[in-house]
UniProtKB/Swiss-Prot annotation:
PANTHER family documented for this protein: 60S RIBOSOMAL PROTEIN L35/50S RIBOSOMAL PROTEIN L29 (PTHR10916), LARGE RIBOSOMAL SUBUNIT PROTEIN UL29C (PTHR10916:SF0)
InterPro entries (alphabetical): Ribosomal_protein_uL29, Ribosomal_uL29, Ribosomal_uL29_sf
GO CC term (a single one): ribosome
Gene Ontology process terms (BP): translation
Compartments where found: Plastid, Chloroplast
Name recorded for this polypeptide: Large ribosomal subunit protein uL29c
Organism: Arabidopsis thaliana (Mouse-ear cress)
Subunit: Part of the 50S ribosomal subunit.
NCBIfam families given in the database record: L29
Entry annotated with the keyword Chloroplast: yes
């Protein structure tokens, strides 16, 4: 714990290079005295920190489980999922621009998922000995080979609309 006290002009001590201490009252700066006080009490931060590691351990295990799940997938599955997630990001941007309701936290979550998957993909390439330049070349080829398709959420929305139309057609017939 620090305490700060302002010294009076008569007790101010100004330290210069050549001397250990010299007292001067001609300066307008009166000096600042900093004292360290040791208290016998246990600070509140110490008691809180002892209980806080439990949630962080849970978060770590959740992240580990997610990474284990990502690493268990093949590279092709990862690429397919990256395409799907990027399509979902596009749909979120579309909802945002149309001023529809959406969760803003989904942007960050999806971007992080894409980054994790691409990181695992790059880790595998490094393990196989693929250099950075060749990796970029392969990525360009992969991106050119992607067939545009609607994201899963849009597919589900289209299926729901088709089911509603079929139900309405059945009612009117």
């Amino acid at each position: 714990m620090l305490s700060l006290s302002i010294a009076t002009p008569g007790t101010a001590a100004i330290f210069r290079r050549g001397t250990a201490s010299a007292t001067s009252t001609s300066s307008s700066f009166h000096g600042v005295r900093i004292q360290h006080q040791v208290s016998a009490r246990v600070p509140a931060a110490a008691t809180i920190s002892s209980s806080s590691p439990k949630p962080s351990v849970v978060m770590m295990s959740k992240r580990e489980a997610e990474l284990k799940e990502i690493r268990s997938k093949t590279t092709e599955q990862l690429q397919e999922e990256v395409v799907d997630l990027k399509g979902e990001l596009f749909m979120l941007r579309l909802q945002k621009s149309a001023r529809n309701e959406f969760k803003s936290s989904d942007f960050r979550r999806m971007k992080k998922q894409v980054a994790r998957m691409l990181t695992v993909k790059r880790e595998r390439e490094i393990k196989e000995g693929i250099k950075k330049r060749l990796s970029r070349k392969l990525d360009r080829q992969w991106k050119k080979s992607i067939v545009p398709r609607p994201p899963p959420s849009l597919k589900k929305l289209q299926e729901e609309e088709a089911a509603e139309e079929a139900a309405e057609a059945a009612k009117s017939a």
